[in-house]
Amino acid sequence: HPILIDKYLAGKEVEVDAICDENGVLIPGIMEHVERAGVHSGDSISVYPTQKIKPEIKQIIVDYTERLAKALHVIGLINIQFIVYEDQVYVIEVNPRSSRTIPYISKVTDIPVVDVATHVIMGKTIKEQGYEYGLAPEKETVAIKMPVFSFEKIKGAEISLGPEMKSTGEVLGISKDFDEAIYKAFMGTGINLPKKKNIICTIKDSAKEEFLPIAKQYYMFGYDLYATEGTYNFLKEHDIPVSKINRIADKTNTIFDLMLTDTVDLIIDIPTRNDNLKDGFVIRRFAVEAGIPIYTSLDTAQALINCLEKRHKGQTSLVDITK
């Protein structure tokens, strides 16, 4: 049987929905994912307009989109997913169809994508409908599309994120700045943003160095860190105050004991491969059933502490996206 092997690039994933006619392409907006490539696009936090993509990289994405649409003779909608890695743009996949991001990008750009594409298919060009080719001007507001999961209703389901889509819905956070927009999105998912200031950390070895500055941020913001042995030793070696908790098999001071005290706000669990056969899976399932927010991506954990640092004293604003 044939096997396809792709090289994995730990880059920034970017997504485009575009409308194509015989003369050109209209790109309502470019969407940037918070989680790096490897997490299914439907499970990633999506940001419009992009926050960390250079203007010259955006232009390359526009150019690739136009060239691909022309080469594939697409009339109507096209969805393209890219990876930006070390200032190089790579194409993950091209889908000559609509995608789940169409309602999102239509709402936040005020371009009725489905309506325009339908008229294109029926013979009316993009320009005849009053739009210009190329990338549409970006809006001043920032819009965050955040996935919602139903793991508590699916007994035994693995919650760590990967290439298989697991989310069952999404919410939208909108503001004039990124940090408030993502703060609203976190609240919209029903997550109790940390209040008790206790966080459990269990991080695989290959991610410990990357986790270090994130751990420092949580500690400096006033959180007490609890960690299993490997993560505990690593944080202690780098002079970050942390309390040790034992694995499930131990009889006292276990991770379960702490979770049962109802004092844990958040769990950051970066699993190893095949961790569903180990303690990690049991911990993640217990957290879901106990209603404790748990993140299995450092990018999400980083986004949360960033917005908490900048939003903890401010009032959230109201934004009318129809204006």
Q: How should these model regions be labeled?
A:
Residues 214-220, 288:
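Surface-exposed amphipathic alpha-helices with a cationic face
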Residues 188-199, 218, 257-264:
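Glycine-rich phosphate/diphosphate-binding loops that line cofactor/substrate pockets in enzymes
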Residues 97, 205-206, 271-275:
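Short glycine-rich anion-binding loops that position phosphate/pyrophosphate groups of nucleotides
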Residues 222-234:
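Short internal beta-strands
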